[in-house]
Amino acid sequence: MNRAGASRQQDFPENLVVSHARRKPQNGGQEPVKQTPNSNTLIGSASPAAGVALPDSHTPRRIFVAGFAHETNTFHPLASTAFSFAQAADQPLPAWQGANVLVVPGLSAQPSGGGTVSQDACREAMNKVLDTLRSAMPVDAVFLRLHGAMYAQGIGPAETVLVALVRSIVGPRAPIACTFDLHGNIPARLAGFGDILVGYKTAPHTDHAQTVDLAGRILLDTLAGSVRPVSSVLPIPIILPGEKAMTTAEPFRSLVEEARRVERQGIRGHQAKILAATLFVGCAWTDSPDTGMSVMITADGSRDAARAAAIHLARLVWEARRQFAFGCESAELDEGISRALAAQESTVFLSDSGDNVTASATGDLPLVLRRLVERNVAGALVAGIGDPPAVRQCLQAGAGKTLRLSIGAGVETRFGPPFAGEALVVRLVENAPIAIVRIGGVEVVLGQAGFTDPGQFKACGLDPLKYKIVVVKEGYLFPGLAGIAPRHIMLLTPGAGDMRIERLAYSRRRKPVFPFEPETNVTFS
């Protein structure tokens, strides 16, 4: 058996450690770098890298690009047992335009379900991604698009394990850049494998392009020899639902602004530049030892500076821990419906947060639909409920027909039975397994649960602003809907994405942690 074949048989344990001598920082010292603070000068971050001259510019630098991402909800009743694959984009990032680089595309892999990733599926997906890397060798650098909250049976934090295995293939000298969602649960040991670690700074997310651009620029500067990135990850013992840490509300807005300031000005007492600073909220619906908030710093050549910046930001987050609250209007189910009906606004969006598909919940709970019908609400739209069998019944009946349907609770059965009632098939969406039905005064989109953008309504022939109430399966509204919603109320409904995380049956979370152990004390040093 060849070496590539043999390497496919390796195990992926949760405590995996890949040992490699890493590149020395630019001062030539051994890591961690020990600096003697000799100045209070605050130093700016890396200069733009686009067009930077690379050594030996006649030979393109080969950058392997791949993706491996998931926001795992371990409270989802079903495991994710399959991945979808696509070839990564082969075009240079905007930050690399004009530079002599060759993008070597690998695979992008993502689980097709929302629940805990099965061990076999994760192993297979990792091996496929790693095989494309082995085939691409030698490479000068690696660029990975990750999420940070993938959790697999028998493997644990799968994205961190993947980065470790990538390091074992490319060796200690090739820089590895990674981008993340700020809802990732980031293990401290990730910093031992990745060089350039950059996450989103906005929730709701509006800075994907900027995050990729920053990581790409730092990677190009690294290849040019103008920076030598080293990273530090510092976990913070706080678990919060993401809706309590939105960058549109305090205290998280100011905390992220401080991270931006650290990027611009550096950290007092250290001359090294801070190339990237990310505050991670974490994903509360992933039950794992790494679940929770953290700080991720990439500095130029000084692990001491990276650690100092991480400590500075972690202390500020910890001091603000009791101030975190929902960054949007919220209410219990009945109260939220009553507020919406009494609202002066022409349309009120209600988000069914417990069944939030953007937090990898099932998207098939009929709780809000049932209550709207029970209260004889008119002018409401539920967008939507995932229920393929109900859609098939509608397709067989045809538009304009009335039939008795059992809706929802096909996957998530822990929070009540399906909704049963007479439904009129209003419309069948062309070339899509989607049906729109009317039950009393409520219209329901069946077959697609994830409505996060106005374009999805348009594709179904719907104008959400023609309804008094629009129910979507989100927590906070994504930017596209937030931009059109006259008013939004987040319903505190049960489900795999329950915002009241104290009701979730954690078994693997760290202890002690705030707010579960409210008197938790911690010092960062």
List the predicted regions and their residue ranges.
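N-terminal amphipathic/basic leader segments beginning at the initiator methionine
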Residues: N40-G98, L107
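Intrinsic low-complexity, disordered N-terminal segments enriched in polar/charged/small residues
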Residues: S7-Q9
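Glycine-rich phosphate/diphosphate-binding loops that line cofactor/substrate pockets in enzymes
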Residues: P55-P60, L133-D140, G336-V348
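Conserved anion/nucleotide-ligand pocket segment
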Residues: V212, D221-R260
